[in-house]
Amino acid sequence: MLNYFNYFTEIEDRFQQRRGALLLLSTLDWALIETWREAGIPLDAALRGIDAAFDRYEARQKKARMRKVNGLAWCAQAVMEAAEELREAAGKHA
């Protein structure tokens, strides 16, 4: 079982890694992570969602100039989609 601290730091590390620059998370970002944790979003879903959001961003960035991603909220929809996919996959295997 992942402890409270690791859930936050793993998400922070992945976001910083995918962004390509050190960016301290804001208090709103930390609150979003807390919301995910309280909602039972698995760490794997959060990390997959961050990766998916940045994959889409990078694909679009090749076509048009886009602003830098400055906050974790930009990944929120992809995290929720990844969590739903994990739930559906778990339901099929149950």
Mark where each language-model region is.
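Intrinsically disordered, low-complexity, basic-enriched segments
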Residues: 1-94
